[in-house]
Regions:
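Solvent-exposed, charged helical/coil patches
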Residues: 1-32, 111-117, 121-126
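Basic, amphipathic alpha-helical patches used to engage nucleic acids or provide basic targeting signals
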Residues: 12, 16, 43-108
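Alpha-helix termination/capping residues and helix-transition junctions
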Residues: 30-33, 80-82
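A short linear hydrophobic-aromatic micro-motif
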Residues: 35-38
Length: 126
């Protein structure tokens, strides 16, 4: 799966939305004290931004994401892998980047959740 998604992730990085570009400017280079990657492959998904150290994913949504069932499934799967997912509307990033960054900073300074004990994940073995 990763071999298929990696070229797509690179294409997405090269064709970022305005909101992604604005937020990346603030996240890159450890500007917030933590390293972020953009358009990163995690399992069968490509996430907009991820901080592996804090197990935090940031997703930016345009109008096409107005309560999408696939987004809910994706978030549940990412949560099951130990990631917290913050979602912001593109317009929020473009109009209130400081407010969005404040929410991200608050989350970055929370302690990491305790991972489930081995064998207690919600994904059944096949």
């Amino acid at each position: 799966m990763k071999k298929i998604l990696t070229p797509l992730a690179k294409k997405l990085r090269n064709n970022s939305t305005d909101a992604e570009k604005h937020l990346w400017y603030s996240l890159r280079g450890e500007n917030l004290g933590f390293k972020f990657r953009r358009q990163a492959v995690i399992g069968r998904y490509i996430v907009d931004f991820v901080c592996f150290e804090k197990r935090l994913i940031i997703e930016l949504d345009g109008g096409q994401h107005a309560h999408n069932l696939k987004d809910d499934q994706r978030t549940r799967w990412l949560n099951a892998q130990g990631f917290d997912v913050l979602r912001f509307w593109d317009n929020d990033v473009l109009r209130n980047r400081d407010g969005v960054l404040q929410k991200i900073i608050e989350r970055l300074h929370l302690p990491l959740p305790i991972p489930p004990h081995k064998g207690e994940g919600i994904e059944p073995r096949v």
